[in-house]
């Protein structure tokens, strides 16, 4: 049986203009990698069709050990309080190779 290890999956939905700021923040907190996907949908701010290609939405996925998560969440919460549009949610995941996320 394959050994699995617990980690946290941080998902952030925001605008493309936030990418550089968030990536810089991730590096500051020791995040080793991330995945960025285009995102479309509707929510509290209305519908985003991504027709213009300008300031469209993206989803960033980051797997982190629990001990790194709190500082990252505090940083995101500060940005939200400053008025940045961020939707943040965290899930429990299991990975085969935990050293990849340290």
Residue ranges and their predicted role:
Residues 1-102:
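Positively charged, small/polar-rich N-terminal and surface patches that mediate targeting and assembly
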